[in-house]
A protein has these predicted regions:
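Leucine-biased recognition of intrinsically disordered, low-complexity hydrophobic segments
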Residues: 6, 21-22
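Conserved Nudix-box catalytic region and its N-terminal flanking loop in Nudix hydrolases
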Residues: 72-114
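Unchanged
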Residues: 98-121, 125-183, 187-188, 192-194, ...
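Conserved hydrophobic/aromatic beta-strand scaffold that supports enzyme active sites
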Residues: 29, 49, 70, 79, ...
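Acidic, metal-coordinating catalytic segment for phosphate/diphosphate chemistry
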Residues: 28-68
Length: 212
């Protein structure tokens, strides 16, 4: 074996170690040869990976990118009420997982079309948010609605334009969405377009946001 420094039983590792090391989507079998994998630190590495000792394949897991945008029309912001878990029934901006083979701006525009049937022009970057516990990076852009022909996509219960004063802050789905919205509005009032950064992580039984 090339990885003798640390070997961890696969089941126990997934339950206890995934928070900082590997994704909680536990891998049991090698996608290359079909044999069982184990979690270990490969030689020359510093983090546990899923390793197949039969064929030697090391399966790397890396953070996922969530791309989204804040579409605006005549001063109002387009929000979607989620039809799926997590946080079903809460409001969010159009956003979702980036696909292979697309640019992050194109992913944000696609998500707006899928979730809100909205045709948007992607603008400057609002925020980059490191959601460390879930191994995600949330990237949110400013956007302009090209028209008001939006509607309810399959992942939304409702889609609506909101004046700043009417945004349902108590019903916003995720801390990352609230961060992006508030920074967007701060910048709009100040007539500027900045990019904002923060980390969201789990401390003492709750999510904590820290600006960078």
């Amino acid at each position: 074996s090339n990885a003798e420094s640390l070997t961890i039983p696969i089941i126990g590792f997934c339950k206890k170690g995934a928070r900082t090391l590997l994704s909680s989507r536990c891998m049991k079998f090698c996608s290359n040869c079909g044999q069982l994998v184990i979690a270990k630190v490969p030689s020359g590495d510093h983090l546990p990976r899923f390793v197949c000792e039969a064929c030697g394949t090391i399966h790397y897991q890396n953070p996922n990118i969530i791309a989204g945008c804040i579409p605006e029309w005549q001063g109002k912001l387009l929000l979607c009420r989620r039809a799926i878990e997590p946080r079903r029934g809460f409001w969010t901006v159009p956003a979702g997982f980036m696909e292979n083979g697309e640019a992050v701006q194109d992913a944000a525009a696609r998500e707006a079309q899928e979730e809100a049937l909205a045709d948007v022009e992607i603008g400057s970057l609002v925020s980059i948010i490191n959601v460390i516990r879930t191994h995600q990076v949330h990237i949110v852009f400013r956007a302009r609605l090209r028209n008001t022909n939006f509607g309810v996509g399959p992942e939304s219960l409702e889609v609506a334009l909101y004046d700043e004063a009417d945004i349902p802050w108590d019903e916003i789905a995720f801390m990352s969405v609230e961060f992006a919205l508030r920074r967007y509005l701060d910048d709009r009032r100040a007539r500027r377009e900045l990019t904002h950064f923060c980390d969201i992580d789990w401390h003492d039984g709750r999510f904590v946001l820290r600006d960078r």
